[in-house]
Structures are given as structure tokens and as C-alpha cells.
């Protein structure tokens, strides 16, 4: 193993001028281009601020990139470009980077629309660095409520919390670390699992009014959902 590693290092040193030249060419080619990718989850029981954290993230992205990106949500975010109504929209080609915000994803995965969820979509989700890029955000009450195939594609997991109804914070974990944290019953061992980064903010009235969760609830009520037997069958197929 040591000899193979030495060989890799020697080849790297010999090829370094070419690598630097090509890397600089990539930087020049992509200068000023917005490219977003990754799948990130926001988790927390009702009232802990998971949808608020996701909305704050969207506000920050819109403030940073303006109209250079598209935003698509299923919970009537006021600054969205499109309404997210079916997974088929993820397979379309977009002329700008797309940020998808998927609130209460476990409910969507149990809808009849998801019954025809194709393997092609999983392939698409793993290739989100291609083209203009797709970044997918989602919320769920618990990590294990989310479809296991979708969990395996996640880049990061935000564990959300809110104090006094106004101060909201979230710690982002590596998915493998977060899975261990969720499965760990001993508090001292849970404390040893460290977050990669964090975010915190005050829930202003403006932020609270940037989406309409009640309208989303009405939309959810109009959907047809699979039975437990159908869900189990779908999971076996995937």
C-alpha cells in the first residue's frame, strides 16, 4: 500500500504543471457562473423551525444570486419562480441553476404521485452537479421518516431548534454522523458527534410571512396517498 501511494504522489508531482494549467482554464471558463448542487435536509418536530430555516436559506440565496437562479417550492414561498407539484419537474432542463425546496418530504413520498417514482430520478439526483445544477432542500420531522434512497443521496442534515418562538438555529451534520446521532440513545455519545457548520437568526415578521404553510396544507389534503401495503411494495421496488 505504501509503495502504491508513493507512486501516486510521484505521478502527481510530474503532472502538476498540466494539472495547474487545466485547473486555471476551468476557473477562467466558469468565472461568474452560478452553479448549485447538493441535497440538504432540515429536521425538527413541529415548532422547531425547520421550514423557517429552509425559507431563510432561500432568502439568502435570492439575495446573493438574484434572478440568476430559479426557486421552486411546494409550500408557496412568496419569492418562488415555479410551484413544485410533481417529481417530473426534476427531470426537466432549466436554463439557470434550480433550487428546489420540498417541505414535509415524507408526505410527498407517500402520495400516489410518488408511486411511479422512477429509478431515473434517483440517477438524476446523484448527477445534480451536471448542467446548470440542481440544489434540493427538504424538510422532515425526523431523519428516519425520509425514504432511505433519498437519505443516501443527502449531502448534509440540519438539526433545527427554536427558543422563545423567535430565535432559530440549526446545526449541519454529515449524513452518516447524523444517522448515528439519531440512532444513539446515550446522551454523552450524542454530544461527541460534532456539527460541520451552523446557522442562527431571528424570526422576523417578514420572514414568517414569506411562505403560506396553510395553503400547502390545503393542497396536501387534496392529494391521494398510498396505503401502508402500497408504500412497502414501492420501497421493495426501489
Model-based region annotation:
Residues 156, 169-238:
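Conserved P-loop NTPase motor module
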Residues 50:
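Conserved lysine of the Walker
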Residues 19-33:
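Pre-Walker A adenine-sensing motif
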Residues 42:
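Hydrophobic anchor at the beta1->P-loop junction of P-loop NTPases
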Residues 46:
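The conserved Walker
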Residues 53:
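Hydrophobic positions on the alpha1 helix immediately C-terminal to the Walker A/P-loop
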Residues 103-104:
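Walker B catalytic acidic pair
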Amino acid at each position: 500500500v505504501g509503495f502504491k501511494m508513493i507512486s501516486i504522489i510521484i505521478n502527481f508531482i510530474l503532472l502538476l504543471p498540466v494539472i495547474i494549467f487545466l485547473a486555471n482554464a476551468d476557473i477562467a471558463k466558469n468565472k461568474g457562473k452560478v452553479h448549485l448542487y447538493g441535497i440538504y435536509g432540515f429536521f425538527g418536530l413541529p415548532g422547531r423551525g425547520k421550514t423557517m430555516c429552509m425559507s431563510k436559506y432561500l432568502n439568502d440565496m435570492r439575495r446573493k444570486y438574484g434572478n440568476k437562479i430559479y426557486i421552486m417550492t411546494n409550500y408557496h414561498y412568496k419569492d418562488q419562480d415555479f410551484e413544485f407539484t410533481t417529481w417530473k419537474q426534476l427531470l426537466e432542463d432549466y436554463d439557470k441553476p434550480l433550487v428546489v425546496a420540498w417541505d414535509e418530504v415524507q408526505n410527498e413520498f407517500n402520495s400516489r404521485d410518488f408511486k411511479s417514482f422512477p429509478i431515473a430520478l434517483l440517477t438524476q439526483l446523484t448527477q445534480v452537479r451536471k448542467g446548470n445544477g440542481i440544489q434540493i432542500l427538504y424538510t422532515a420531522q425526523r431523519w428516519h421518516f425520509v425514504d432511505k434512497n433519498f437519505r443516501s443521496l443527502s449531502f448534509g442534515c440540519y438539526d433545527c431548534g427554536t427558543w422563545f418562538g423567535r430565535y432559530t438555529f440549526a446545526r449541519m451534520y454529515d449524513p452518516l454522523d447524523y444517522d448515528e446521532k439519531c440512532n444513539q440513545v446515550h446522551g454523552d455519545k450524542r454530544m461527541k458527534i460534532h456539527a460541520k457548520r451552523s446557522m442562527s437568526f431571528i424570526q422576523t415578521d417578514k420572514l414568517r410571512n414569506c411562505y403560506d404553510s396553510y395553503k400547502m396544507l390545503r393542497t396536501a389534503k387534496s392529494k391521494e396517498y398510498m396505503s401502508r401495503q402500497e408504500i412497502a411494495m414501492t420501497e421493495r421496488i426501489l
